[in-house]
UniProtKB/Swiss-Prot annotation:
It is an enzyme of class 4 (lyase). The active site is at residues 17, 147. Keywords: Glycosidase, Hydrolase, Lyase, Manganese, Metal-binding. One of its GO terms (biological process) is nucleobase catabolic process. GO terms for molecular function: hydrolase activity, acting on glycosyl bonds; metal ion binding; pseudouridylate synthase activity. Its cofactor is Mn(2+). The gene is psuG. The keyword Iron does not apply. This is Pseudouridine-5'-phosphate glycosidase. No activity can be observed at or below 50 degrees Celsius. The lineage of its organism: Bacteria, Thermotogati, Thermotogota, Thermotogae, Thermotogales.
Length: 285
């Protein structure tokens, strides 16, 4: 597999998906987030490698111009399974968490960041590739838990079944993207050094799983999960498959007068900071 990597060797690096920019946010906010994330990476001393597929070419370290081109021209939303297809067909494609972890590991990136991961959708057999990729690839993934639109109980059980290790960063509860609380307890850690110790143990055991580091949305931007659930009940689903998540997130932005968008941007910024700190200290260890 040929990946055009623009990563400077020897420096800490964090991999980031393109789906969050192309399918998860309005264009203006997506570009602002990209610029802010790059600014954070410069301030904190790490490289941010935004990973995507441009006309069949896999790129690790996309530029703002390339990201804008992807938004303008359109891009498929792909998990690990679809990568060879879009590459062979020369298409544009935005990577999900699963594809980003898979491609990151192929070029030596150990730390990946996102907003929220996929999981099990309610009411039907719809399980995200994010879960299966995390169950077979060793990496550190910083997120704010699973997306609030998912079946929380089923996803939590699937994470256990797939033996995916997870820890709460300064929290005792599994966060749900816009919401800090779920009622499900997780092992709590207080600092990045604890992340590194756990990850080192995983390496020693040759445990090929992704360590989920759960970083809750900042308290001032939180939207309680019961409020999100009430709103979701009012939405009539008009799409299926990979279009479900972007559709629901867009509807929630409209129904909350932009509160979910502000929460999304805030948690993504904090997750980039934490992932960068982990990558920097991992490189030194």
């Amino acid at each position: 597999m040929i990946i055009e990597s623009r990563i400077e060797k020897g420096k800490p690096v964090v991999g980031m998906e393109t789906t969050v920019f192309v399918h998860g946010l309005p264009r203006k906010e997506a570009i602002e987030l990209f610029r802010r994330a790059k600014e954070i990476s410069r301030e904190k001393g790490f490289q941010l490698a935004v990973i995507g597929i441009l006309k069949g070419k896999i790129v690790a370290g996309m530029s703002e111009e390339e990201l804008e081109a992807m938004m303008r021209e359109g891009a498929d939303k792909v998990g690990t399974r679809e990568i060879p297809i879009v590459v062979a067909e020369g298409k544009n494609a935005a990577t999900t968490v699963s594809a980003t972890i898979f491609l990151s590991r192929r070029i030596g990136i150990e730390v990946v960041v996102t907003g929220g991961t996929g999981g099990v959708h309610p009411g039907r057999v719809d399980v995200s590739q994010d879960l299966t990729e995390m169950s077979s690839s060793r990496a550190v993934l910083v997120s704010s838990g699973i997306k609030s639109i998912l079946d929380v109980e089923a996803t939590f059980e699937m994470l256990e079944t797939l033996e995916i290790p997870l820890v709460g960063f300064r929290t005792n509860e599994f966060p749900l993207f816009f919401s800090r609380k779920s009622g499900r307890r997780v092992p709590r850690i207080e600092n990045v050094e604890e992340v590194l110790k756990i990850y080192e143990s995983m390496k020693e055991m040759e445990l090929e799983k992704t360590l989920m580091v759960l970083n809750p949305v900042p308290e001032e931007y939180e939207i309680p999960h019961d409020e999100i659930e009430r709103l979701l009940e009012k939405i009539e689903l008009e799409v299926e498959g990979k279009e479900v998540t972007p559709f629901l997130l867009k509807k929630l932005v409209e129904m909350t007068n932009g509160r979910t968008l502000k929460a999304n941007l805030a948690l993504l910024e904090e997750n980039v900071k934490l992932a960068g700190e982990i990558a920097v200290k991992l490189k030194r260890s």
